[in-house]
Structures are given as C-alpha cells and as structure tokens.
Design a protein with these regions (language model features):
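Conserved glycine-rich Rossmann-like NAD(P)H-binding loop of the short-chain dehydrogenase/reductase
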Residues: 29-45
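SDR active-site lid
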Residues: 181-260
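Residue(s) in the substrate-gating loop at a strand-loop-helix junction
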Residues: 148
Length: 300
C-alpha cells in the first residue's frame, strides 16, 4: 500500500501504546480512523485528541476477546465509512511466571486478548476486504498483526505470553500464504517488537474481574512482572518510531517488521539449533548475567 490518505483504518488497543501511535501517525497521513479499546476513558481521550486535530475518527469500546464485539466493530465501521483498508490487530496483554504456576484464568485472559482477538479480526474483516477487492480493481487493503519478539524466541517465565505470540506469527504467515492464492490487493504483515515503553507492562489494569486470580502471585510471577517493568520502562525506542516503521513496511510490502534488528541474534541462534537438532539454547546467551540473576531471584 503506497497511499494512505482517505483510507479507513481499524485499530484495536488504540487508546495507548502502539495502537495510539498507529492512530496518531495515520492521522498525519489523512486517514479515517476507527479506534477500539476496552478502556473507555482512555479511548474517549484519544478520540478527542485526534478530533481536535481535524481527524475523522470514531471510537468503539470493544472487548476484542469476544467475537460478537469484534463483529459489532466491523458493522459500525462499515455503516460509518462503508469500507475498511487497514486493520491493526494490536490489542495485547501479558502474564508471566513459570508455566506450571500459571492458572487457567491466566491462559484464558492472555490467549483471549492476544490470540483470539487476532483470529476474530482476520475472520471478520478479511472477507470484507476481499469483497471490496472483487468489486474494485483499485482497492487496496493491509492487515497488521502485532506479535512480539516473544513470537520468535522463548524466554523463561514468559510461557503464556510466548505461546500467544508464537501463534500470532503462525497465523500471520498462514494468512500471507492464503491471501497470495486469491488476491494481489489484500496484504498482511506481522510486527515483532522488542521492549518499548508503551505501558504494556501495566496491562493487568484491564483484566476482567471474572478472570482475576484469587491467590497471591508466586515468586516467579512477581519476578517476571518486575523484569517486565524494568525492560519496558528502560526501553529507548518509542511507540511513535515503531508506528513510522510499520507504515513504511506497508509501503514497501514487507511482511516481517522488527523494531530492534540488533536483537535478532537469539532468533538466528534458535533456528540454527532447530536445524542442528540441538537442545534449546539460552535466549540470554548474549547477556549471561540476566540468566544468573533470574535463577538466583526465583530460587530465593
């Protein structure tokens, strides 16, 4: 996709972090925006901010883990703008700790937001895009699914999150191949960011009460949260920079989008180990002190 002016973008997780940055940058390109988020006050504030700049934008409170609410999001988009050109499946949450200590509710919450939301978005919006492409040879569309570097490597104490993001990478790669069989007008990308100061580490603020854990967090869960807090808050690349990279990747037709190319060594190491049938290597190999500190801390 080369031109973005007057195109319609649907963005989930749009009230903060990457989603808000996608919206803000899209607004500078003259796009029409449909913003979805579960946090109503933050969503309203983002919509108001963009409207004050002259952007044509609406907000739709959406629990993206629920198919019926994503369907409502699509219905409102079509009734308001009549089309959709960009879909950012971006909403995401996290829960850490040893995989045997994660509860059923941890899995339900993280997979619901991180994976099921992408499934719902692809299943509901892709047919709308393909139908528009069949009716108009000039129509263009693009889907961006936000995964993570955790969709390419498996760090300890991040099992639930790792599983969800590996699944998003797999879904996105399959979507790429499937679209290639039927159209030249609808494309997709997968964004694999490293740590970025987005407030993602505080995603538990939007965890539904029905999926809250009754028990006190375990030591490994507390350590994982502390590591996430430190990594996110100390990150140097901003969400705004990632948004610009993402739009540029769409212009160039890139599928894989990496926020930190210098962090790809563990990915290369992992695939070399797979090919050599080696046991999994240390994802912290470049920073051995991290593994030592983690082991010492979780053991108490």
């Amino acid at each position: 996709m080369k031109q973005f002016e007057n195109k319609v973008a649907v963005i989930t997780g749009a009230a903060s972090g990457f989603g808000k940055a996608f919206a803000a940058y899209g607004a500078t390109l003259g796009m029409k925006l449909v913003l979805a988020d579960i946090q109503q006050d933050a969503l309203d504030a983002t919509v108001s901010e963009l409207k004050s700049r002259g952007t044509e934008v609406i907000g739709v409170r959406t629990d993206v883990s629920l198919a019926r609410e994503v369907q409502t999001l699509a219905d409102i988009t079509m009734s308001t703008f009549g089309t959709v050109n960009l879909l950012f499946n971006n909403a995401g949450v996290g829960a850490g700790g040893f995989v045997w200590e994660n509860t059923e509710k941890d899995w339900e919450w993280v997979l619901g937001v991180n994976l099921n939301s992408v499934i719902h978005g692809v299943r509901i919006f892709t047919p709308l895009m393909l139908d528009a492409a069949a009716r108009d040879a000039a129509y263009e569309a693009h889907i961006v699914n936000t995964a993570s570097m955790s969709g390419l490597v498996n760090a300890p104490t991040m099992g639930v999150y790792n599983v969800s993001k590996h699944a998003v990478v797999s879904l996105s790669e399959t979507l790429y191949h499937d679209l290639g069989l039927v159209t030249d007008q609808v494309h997709c990308s997968v964004l694999c960011p490293y740590f970025v100061p987005t407030g993602f580490n505080q995603s538990r603020r939007n965890r539904p009460a029905s999926l809250a854990n009754a028990q006190t967090p375990t030591r490994s869960q507390q350590v994982a949260q502390a590591m996430s807090d430190k990594a996110v808050t100390s990150a140097r690349i901003s969400a705004d920079e990632i948004a610009q990279q993402t739009y540029q990747a769409m212009r160039e037709g890139d599928f894989y989008i990496y926020s930190h190319p210098e962090a790809m060594d563990p990915v290369k190491q992992r695939f070399e180990q797979l090919l050599a049938r080696c046991n999994p290597g240390d994802p912290f190999a470049g920073h051995p002190e991290l593994r030592r500190n983690l082991a010492r801390t979780v053991r108490g």
